[in-house]
Amino acid sequence: MSLSFDPQAGLIVVPTRIWGPAGETVARLALDTGATWSLLSWDVAVLLGYDPSIVQERLQIVTASGVEFVPTIGLQKLEALDRTCEGFPMLCHTLPMGATVDGLLGLNFFQGHRLVVDFREATVTLD
């Protein structure tokens, strides 16, 4: 499946359908090949019925403000770029004020697949 994007926009935003205990939503996740893990905003996780505050499993990440330990949740289901994952592991973290996305699609989503970002055609393809 190919997704069109605006090469002048700065971020490549991937519409991502996510299911949780309280329902489903379409989140706006930035494609981020510099992120090892995919990340969902704390607010969206809570909206979907997850409670990141009670999660025992935490992963150390480095942010612009320092080192933090953030909860990891297993999503009921996630669909993006024609790929469906059940139990997909995702970090939860508060995003900065003014963020225009709901999180990041990182390398753990793309591993084992071929990702092509074509700036001439302004498309993203995941095989």
Language-model features: locations:
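Pepsin/retropepsin-fold aspartyl endopeptidases
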Residues: 1-127
